[in-house]
């Protein structure tokens, strides 16, 4: 490089250094640091509770774990007309957490314990609607008076399982926005249609949003239960819960009154389903009891655990221990493979919530059985057995499943257990499971029914004819050809019948073996190897148990079908699981094959707005 080039380079460097020094402030007093970030907006959380003793430990636990600075949150908590321990739980929680929050307003009302015009604790009378509107309006007024940026309404049985919910809703920048909450049915906390009289209207837009086939933040005519209002928006000043708008002529219902207020203020409600935010129970009919409500919420907790971890309980309230029992069974068996710890923990927590005592049985893992062990057990496959869908022989997984049940039958016989219940670990319980099962046991005793085995969950394979109802026993049919051994009741005599058939020397899958033993298997060649085939088998109807996952579902795992052949450890059977028909959902029944309508559950107290 020439001397002239070097000089130009030096001058350029000097100029750059000068610019940098000027930008940093030549003198110390001219230097500055970047601005700090904005503080989180202030939020008032309004929690209204009545007879919520069963749900509060989990609902408050969710509030405890929200990812939002508690010093930016104020609490507005009201409770009234309680027949349970709701007031004491809320008082204890507020005493323990009040120093974490910016402000706490506590509005308990001890008496009266019911409204004069209500027919029961789940009946929404005119007085109750009016009172809840006044409470919501009082919370809204408090938020405005303290200049809160937002008010977040939360029902006392709505579970926020996503700790980012508040941040996510604020980020949407909407005047009124709700997180879509999941339930065990199609019900959720929004409507997609509304009639000109303000009533619910079914629309084709609802289910794609509810199923998250469409994801986003959608304009809807109604959100309720859990929602956020941005009080910084000018239009929010026109929103009110009480009194109803001067032009209001629709039904006197708090959620409809507020939806009308939004409409009059030209405020669009929005529903977001981008994430899993939380869950809510399906509401009960007006004649429901507090026991129904408690069981309904327990079922909501169980459904949460099917796809996620157990709910957090608030550490700031005293929670009494549950007292599990075996109902009237001599034993309750839970089958689980040791290496399926996630299933084990879920079922342990599930049975605890249902207050069912049980004995954990380590399942036989078929893949670990060597040929010597198989020979010592005397296991031989039923001649010419082929899987009905794939034409393959028995798998080691199916062998392990059979042995797991076989070992329980042996224990029942050896311990002389009169009546036992058997559960696998991949099932989900229907609502009111324990009470419905207790009713069944009572009816069996009253009718003096002679039985050996009763399916609690199954896949009905005979779909052409209805099954025969059992006289004198509600919700019970004579079982036809069925798959699955999710859960069943078995008598001592039934266990002995299965053992006496010597199934190990002519083994087939356990859910094929049982229909053979009650003489309803469609393949006579299989049945001909067993005699007598006099197992007295029945099934509850409607079912009390279902699988947690079906073929093709996210998270579906099969230890029976994805295995190796029983006599060839080198040949895997992990075919396309999305096409495995045996573990698919129940095939739709023809109308003439439906079991009697009178078999509907007496516990079905659900209000089904969107079911």
Curated annotation (Swiss-Prot):
Alphabetical list of Pfam families matching this protein: Anp1 (PF03452), Glyco_transf_25 (PF01755)
Gene Ontology molecular function: procollagen galactosyltransferase activity
Function: Beta-galactosyltransferase that transfers beta-galactose to hydroxylysine residues of type I collagen. By acting on collagen glycosylation, facilitates the formation of collagen triple helix.
This protein's encoding gene: colgalt1-a
Gene Ontology annotations of biological process type: positive regulation of collagen fibril organization
Region Disordered: start-end pairs: 575-611
Annotated EC: 2.4.1.50
Protein name (Swiss-Prot/TrEMBL): Procollagen galactosyltransferase 1-A
Organism whose genome encodes this protein: Xenopus laevis
Signal peptide stretch: 1-24
Keyword flag Endoplasmic reticulum: yes
């Amino acid at each position: 490089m020439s001397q002239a080039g070097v000089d130009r380079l030096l001058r350029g460097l000097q100029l750059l250094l000068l610019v940098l020094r000027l930008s940093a402030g030549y003198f110390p007093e001219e230097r500055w640091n970047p601005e700090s970030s904005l503080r989180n907006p202030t939020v008032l959380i309004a929690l209204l509770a009545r007879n919520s003793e069963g749900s509060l430990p989990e609902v408050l636990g969710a509030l405890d774990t929200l990812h939002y600075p508690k010093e930016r949150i104020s609490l507005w908590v009201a409770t009234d007309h309680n027949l349970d321990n709701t007031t004491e739980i809320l008082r204890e929680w507020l005493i323990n957490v009040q120093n974490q929050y910016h402000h706490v307003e506590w509005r308990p009302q001890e008496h009266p314990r019911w409204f004069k015009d209500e027919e029961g604790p789940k009946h929404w009378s005119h007085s109750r609607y009016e009172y809840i509107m006044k409470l919501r309006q009082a919370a809204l007024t408090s938020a405005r008076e303290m200049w809160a940026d937002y008010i977040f309404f939360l029902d006392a049985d709505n579970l926020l399982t996503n700790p980012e919910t508040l941040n996510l809703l604020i980020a949407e920048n909407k005047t009124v926005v709700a997180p879509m909450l999941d339930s065990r049915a199609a019900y959720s906390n929004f409507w997609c249609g509304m009639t000109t009289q303000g009533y619910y209207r079914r629309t084709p837009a609802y289910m794609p949003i509810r199923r998250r086939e469409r994801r986003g933040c959608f304009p809807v005519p109604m959100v309720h239960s859990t929602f956020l209002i941005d009080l910084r928006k000018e239009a929010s000043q026109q929103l009110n819960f009480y009194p109803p708008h001067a032009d209001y002529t629709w039904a006197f219902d708090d959620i409809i009154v507020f939806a009308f207020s939004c409409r009059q203020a030209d405020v669009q409600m929005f529903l977001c389903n981008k994430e899993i935010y939380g869950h809510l129970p399906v509401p009960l009919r007006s004649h429901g009891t507090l026991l129904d409500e408690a069981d309904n919420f327990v079922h909501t907790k169980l459904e949460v655990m099917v796809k996620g971890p157990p709910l957090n309980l608030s550490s700031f309230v005293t929670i009494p221990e549950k007292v599990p029992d075996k109902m009237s069974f001599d034993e309750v068996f839970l089958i689980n493979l040791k290496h399926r710890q996630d299933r084990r923990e879920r079922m342990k927590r599930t049975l605890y919530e249902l207050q069912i005592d049980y004995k954990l049985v380590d399942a036989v893992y078929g893949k670990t059985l060597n040929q010597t062990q198989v020979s010592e057990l005397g296991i031989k496959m039923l001649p010419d057995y082929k899987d009905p869908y794939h034409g393959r022989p028995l798998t080691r997984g199916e062998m392990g499943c059979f042995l797991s049940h076989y070992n329980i039958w042996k224990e029942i016989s050896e311990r002389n257990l009169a009546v036992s219940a058997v559960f696998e670990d991949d099932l989900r319980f229907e609502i009111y499971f324990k009470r419905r099962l207790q009713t069944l046991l009572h009816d069996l005793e009253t009718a003096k029914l002679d039985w050996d085995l009763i399916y609690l969950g199954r896949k009905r394979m005979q779909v052409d004819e209805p099954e025969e109802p059992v006289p004198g026993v509600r919700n019970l049919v004579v079982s036809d050809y069925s798959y699955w051994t999710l859960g069943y009741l078995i008598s001592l005599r039934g266990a002995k019948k299965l053992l006496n058939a010597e199934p190990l020397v002519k083994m087939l899958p356990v859910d094929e073996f049982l229909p053979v033993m009650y003489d309803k298997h469609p393949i006579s060649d299989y049945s001909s190897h067993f005699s007598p085939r006099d197992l007295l088998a029945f099934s509850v109807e409607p079912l009390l148990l279902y699988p947690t996952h079906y073929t093709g579902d996210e998270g579906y795992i099969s230890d029976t079908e994805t295995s190796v052949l029983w006599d060839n450890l080198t040949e895997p059977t992990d075919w396309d699981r999305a096409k495995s028909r045996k573990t698919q959902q129940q095939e739709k029944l023809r109308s003439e094959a439906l079991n009697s309508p009178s078999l509907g559950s007496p516990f079905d107290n659900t209000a089904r707005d969107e079911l």
